[in-house]
Amino acid sequence: MDGPGASAVVVRVGIPDLQQTKCLRLDPTAPVWAAKQRVLCALNHSLQDALNYGLFQPPSRGRAGKFLDEERLLQDYPPNLDTPLPYLEFRYKRRVYAQNLIDDKQFAKLHTKANLKKFMDYVQLHSTDKVARLLDKGLDPNFHDPDSGECPLSLAAQLDNATDLLKVLRNGGAHLDFRTRDGLTAVHCATRQRNAGALTTLLDLGASPDYKDSRGLTPLYHSALGGGDALCCELLLHDHAQLGTTDENGWQEIHQACRFGHVQHLEHLLFYGANMGAQNASGNTALHICALYNQESCARVLLFRGANKDVRNYNSQTAFQVAIIAGNFELAEVIKTHKDSDVVPFRETPSYAKRRRLAGPSGLASPRPLQRSASDINLKGDQPAASPGPTLRSLPHQLLLQRLQEEKDRDRDGELENDISGPSAGRGGHNKISPSGPGGSGPAPGPGPASPAPPAPPPRGPKRKLYSAVPGRKFIAVKAHSPQGEGEIPLHRGEAVKVLSIGEGGFWEGTVKGRTGWFPADCVEEVQMRQYDTRHETREDRTKRLFRHYTVGSYDSLTSHSDYVIDDKVAILQKRDHEGFGFVLRGAKAETPIEEFTPTPAFPALQYLESVDVEGVAWRAGLRTGDFLIEVNGVNVVKVGHKQVVGLIRQGGNRLVMKVVSVTRKPEEDGARRRAPPPPKRAPSTTLTLRSKSMTAELEELASIRRRKGEKLDEILAVAAEPTLRPDIADADSRAATVKQRPTSRRITPAEISSLFERQGLPGPEKLPGSLRKGIPRTKSVGEDEKLASLLEGRFPRSTSMQDTVREGRGIPPPPQTAPPPPPAPYYFDSGPPPTFSPPPPPGRAYDTVRSSFKPGLEARLGAGAAGLYDPSTPLGPLPYPERQKRARSMIILQDSAPEVGDVPRPAPAATPPERPKRRPRPSGPDSPYANLGAFSASLFAPSKPQRRKSPLVKQLQVEDAQERAALAVGSPGPVGGSFAREPSPTHRGPRPGSLDYSSGEGLGLTFGGPSPGPVKERRLEERRRSTVFLSVGAIEGSPPSADLPSLQPSRSIDERLLGTGATTGRDLLLPSPVSALKPLVGGPSLGPSGSTFIHPLTGKPLDPSSPLALALAARERALASQTPSRSPTPVHSPDADRPGPLFVDVQTRDSERGPLASPAFSPRSPAWIPVPARREAEKPPREERKSPEDKKSMILSVLDTSLQRPAGLIVVHATSNGQEPSRLGAEEERPGTPELAPAPMQAAAVAEPMPSPRAQPPGSIPADPGPGQGSSEEEPELVFAVNLPPAQLSSSDEETREELARIGLVPPPEEFANGILLTTPPPGPGPLPTTVPSPASGKPSSELPPAPESAADSGVEEADTRSSSDPHLETTSTISTVSSMSTLSSESGELTDTHTSFADGHTFLLEKPPVPPKPKLKSPLGKGPVTFRDPLLKQSSDSELMAQQHHAASTGLASAAGPARPRYLFQRRSKLWGDPVESRGLPGPEDDKPTVISELSSRLQQLNKDTRSLGEEPVGGLGSLLDPAKKSPIAAARLFSSLGELSTISAQRSPGGPGGGASYSVRPSGRYPVARRAPSPVKPASLERVEGLGAGVGGAGRPFGLTPPTILKSSSLSIPHEPKEVRFVVRSVSARSRSPSPSPLPSPSPGSGPSAGPRRPFQQKPLQLWSKFDVGDWLESIHLGEHRDRFEDHEIEGAHLPALTKEDFVELGVTRVGHRMNIERALRQLDGS
């Protein structure tokens, strides 16, 4: 009205209430409503209840005054000609009295509140007579009920059978357009109540169907919005209701009908001319809305009626694309496959009520017909409505309406019929309808609620058809109907009805059993075919439908998925008995199918191939990394959990028929999109982990897919960049890279890495020999590179072990990471473990690790490494695969062990190297995980989680590379070193790979395999260390070789596989395998079941049976064998095994389950144990090598003793992985002290490192322990399991830990994974340690390894390669954590993860959150004999280490703090062991390491103390007691454990282990610490050493020889095997406790304990001034400000800097939010106060 057109008329409007008069130009051709709005806008005063003001035409010329009906045109009311200007009043709508019936007093008396309330009650009670009486007295019915806001007319409109009441009210002066307080008219109310009778009456009384409510919405809009019986919708449309009303968001009725799936309303709207192309404010048409909200029926109607499916919304998306984005693939397919030839426009014309005056309607009608005419070909403007309805008026737009009608027909023919019939069919006019209304007023089950109405009228005239029904819809009679009129047919419940057409009045025409006729629409209900599909369809069918888009290219036009090329194929795999299928399976873990999972083009199924061995069985069958499993042996597995799929694969035996879908991005998408197309990032995983979230949030998932694409690109780029670093890996992983999805963390460029290193004082990657390490580098790089690359990318490679574990624990594993390419970057790290530290990927990344813990790559690597290691010794070859598989845990590792083995050797000159390279491609049959599957079936199955760890599918190659590397470095055993399959998961943690690798074979080989020149070996070890992946793979794979171990062995899992080379089945297998290996060692060259001759880890050459390495391997094997029984109980942990935890984790977390993992790391042969040491060795190979002879001896002796007391060894390894650790430790020990270690696999791992023949010739101190050690050893397996559990625990703490680790460059999960293996390797590290040590093989680094080269490795390599050196622990922890998180053992594993985050270096790793769940387990194991068991071992191993550590600690000042704590725990068995360890500590190598070990021990002890404090044990006894056998402070040990244990929180894992078990748990935390320790890296030798010292002390105690301590320290120190039960127990509790808080209670006795600070974390146990930057990061995490951690660490902010930080400093550090700064300052004040 504001801008009236040429026809505008000037009208004088008086507003009596405001005593104003306005002259306004109003448009006579517009509705009165528009004029009213014009007036309201012109007012300068607000009116109360303005909506109920109306334009009143005063009486004139004998005519009574009246209010103008708002929906009629202004020109319908002739102006008063008595005045010069037309005059209208704007006044509140009151009853208009024909004459002054009553005076004011009487009026006031009538309208009292009581009377008005009484009047409303009369209306409510249908008291028509009383209502009429009051109205006759002059009561004005236009008022609001003070309570409900209703007015009498609106209330009556909601009542059934209120026709008479409505008439009385209307005649009594009620305004039809009077609105309730909510702004609704009676017509709106009747429509919303679906009261067709009342609506009909109101319309008959002259109400307009187009009254607007307070939002300007019409009754028709409300009808489409509310759904239910479509009769009201039909009545309104029939009465010329206006179409196209839009709300504030531009939604029209058609949009709302589609939004809520009101098909019949939609059909009616379309029939009456609704614009199918109408777009809302976002540009979405009704079809877009259907696509978005998955309303398939509505979409079919729209398409059938000719909707344009090519219209794009304002985001330039078609409906098809919207459907894809929303994850509604079935609907997307419907849209995609719809053809124009399928369109059937309405052939009929809509009927209209003729009673409406054309004046008002003409305006309305005209536009409507036009609308329809545009789309209707059959528009016959004049076609009268055949229906006898009140007054059907046919408009030109009837054709349009016809079209709509047809659509509606399809939808709900009956609804309209009923509605119209009532009014038009002669049913008896509106009144009749009204009765029917009540019946049909409620929402009818069927489309036509009016059906009751129709029956109401006795004489039913002939039904009139409105339009044809949409074909393809199925209806079933839900209630019986008996014919009551002409042409009607009877219906019986349950009959299938074919609807032919939609008639008037809610009647539909249909056919039932040959009978054709009319029936009420509400008698039938539509049955969604889709529902049937989902109910009866197998997942396979669903998958077929889902992927049809891919195959038919239906997604081609979808931008989001246009970059995906979906290719489905059926592969038939036939393998030999002892080989695998050659692929690693990864995916979500779930006991039951995850129905919430919605396949997307990028992530079509939950399980996918994380890696495929090149030239393996699967490869030859055409399977490739990243392929999603749709069917396995004919069973649809799109939504099936990992374990079940593994079970299906195993059930098939040697034959496997898999239907897979390859999702690849189109090459054209060169841009960022070309990343990893296949698996969505981890959306499903999230969905995996949080399955409902990711999987269900289609849009989110879509976004994640896009993100993934970006990541993919990153991976590709990374691969491109990495080749320069190591082309090998690039080649091997190039495919993986593409296939594997990388975590979304940002990529770190080499430059950034360098700067990171510089910042952290770590040697740059270039410094790391690993990267350039001869053949190994690339091999290593495959797995490690990924990690490194991920690190470089800023994304931690998925820490397969940890992350996966966590993830696996609950959730779908992330899609295959197409991040294999990233490994190249990790390769850098590989070369330098320090990078591990340096690239602290974003916490997210680190946490990605949680997700990533599911890294297939790592898993694969682990498996591969193990296999490789084992491979060197003949039997080991096959076993490795199973172990590797186990490691893969969640992922079915179907790679052949042999190939892995082959790969590992590649770097080294021995025969192994060639094989390793092979393995990298993983072509050989043995490589096939399935080959292992046979033997490890159970384990594999159970290990689904562990397997999962091998998360990077692509990484499998990397694993192989790692194996090659390991083989190279470790020689034959090297592969064992390579057993850090974890490492293979490049995504796990960039930094970790190095550690893993280093630990893996090389260090081991150097230490025990003398074949390679010491320096060369050391160098190799170092490289390997850097490329933990490689070594890890070797070690793990090597270890796992136990053929006996069924892949599915539940508890055995990877650790077990690793541990048991096949000597036994199940967990025992794992242990036995080490034992077997040991036996062969003892027996002679062929000591291990895997191979009579052990192969040098570094050189790959057969070891001289008498050589320390061979002895250590043999001892380890023996220990494993002895442990086997203990392990067998681990089946409980089978879930853990399933979870792809780190090897160590496996062993630690679940001795049996995980045991294989650890075992591989400590493979019965030297390879098995090598991993632990190897990892350490990798870091400290040089040192280790140097120490190799003597250190090894003493260490080995220690370890041997420890080995005897597997618990101790396990404990040592415990941190790493309880089961694994012992295995690793034992293996290491065995290696050094060949036969002697047989009983103590753990010890072997721990001792093997330092002592060539720990078992054979236990050192003075160690020998005493051997007995207990053995006992421990036996129990240790249980403990080991306990350790394993922690990995599962990747809870928030874990997350933090991971984050921290990532930041530090140690990614806990991978590290854990690696740790499991690395730890194993590190023990052998003493000899190789020097080699590995990035920092020169100096006594000090060694000393960091305190008792054994481990310390050295830790100190040098570990520091340089935090991942490497601390990796063993960290990795162990990670592994554990991973296992834990992934596995059912999550409770235990969780702790581990957390723990490992914080400890070393202030490192996040330590105790970020000791797995809490493990707590209980830890405790029970602690109490159990295992602890005792472990204690001897611990004491032995730990004592020797601790002694040495103590020595150093004392010198460093660590001893005092750590000493007390340690003894406390250790005091029980520890004291005994301690005595031995003291002697052990005399070992030259360990001595050098001692200071570091002590510091680490001290740090750990401090943490433990803190934890212990919670337990009530002395907080600071820590290192000193730990180191000092005399000090029998189990609590101290426990504390250490706690700190470490927290990390590994494996305490509870091995309940069977008894005290040893407790110790095992301890070890687990230790694993965490190792990571931390590793974190320090060469850059922070002091803190690292200190941490390491602590770790070494604990670890040392755990593994007698210095070699092991660092590695073991990490795992062991926490576990403090020496302190068997008590320590373990305490640790366990502490761990659990710590897990959240971290070992803050422990003060930081160790000088280098900087990292520890905070009750549960290392930092909590140190004074603020001693905090390292990692402690600061942990502390930030603890106050929930972890997002600032990266910046703080980048700026090298240490504890001493915190108090001096100013506001400007905080801003520079990224703390821009005042609240965050205040929180930090408050927390600092609290620290000061405390």
UniProtKB/Swiss-Prot annotation:
Organism of this sequence: Mus musculus (Mouse)
Residue positions where Phosphotyrosine is found in the record: 122, 555, 930
Example of a GO biological process term: exploration behavior
Signal peptide: none
Coiled coil ranges: 1494-1514
TM annotation in the entry: none
Location of the protein in the cell: Cytoplasm; Synapse; Postsynaptic density; Cell projection, Dendritic spine
Source organism phylogeny: Eukaryota, Metazoa, Chordata, Craniata, Vertebrata
Domain of life: Eukaryota
Start-end of Basic and acidic residues biased regions: 404-415, 1016-1026, 1174-1194, 1360-1370
Matches recorded under SMART domains: ANK (SM00248), PDZ (SM00228), SAM (SM00454), SH3 (SM00326)
Location of the SH3 domain: 470-529
Name assigned to this protein: SH3 and multiple ankyrin repeat domains protein 3
Free-text comment about domains: In isoform 1, the N-terminal region preceding the ANK repeats interacts with the 6 ANK repeats in an intramolecular manner, thereby restricting access to ligands, such as SHARPIN and SPTAN1.
Compositionally biased residues, Low complexity: 857-869, 1078-1092, 1235-1250, 1371-1392, 1627-1637, 1649-1658
Entry-linked Gene3D superfamilies: 2.30.42.10, Ankyrin repeat-containing domain (1.25.40.20), Phosphatidylinositol 3-kinase Catalytic Subunit, Chain A, domain 1 (3.10.20.90), SH3 Domains (2.30.30.40), Transcription Factor, Ets-1 (1.10.150.50)
Presence of the UniProt keyword Ribonucleoprotein in the record: no
Region (Disordered) residue spans: 354-466, 664-688, 760-1460, 1475-1524, 1546-1584, 1627-1663
Each ANK repeat, start to end: 148-178, 182-211, 215-245, 249-278, 282-311, 315-345
Region Required for interaction with ABI1, residue ranges: 677-684
Repeat is among the record's keywords: yes
Disruption outcome: Animals deficient for isoforms 1-7 exhibit self-injourious repetitive grooming and deficits in social interaction. They show defects at striatal synapses and cortico-striatal circuits with an increase in striatal volume, dendritic length, and surface area and a decrease of spine density, length and thickness of PSD. They seem to have an altered molecular composition of postsynaptic machinery in the striatum. In contrast, animals deficient for isoforms 1 and 2 exhibit a normal initiation of social interaction with a perturbed recognition of social novelty.
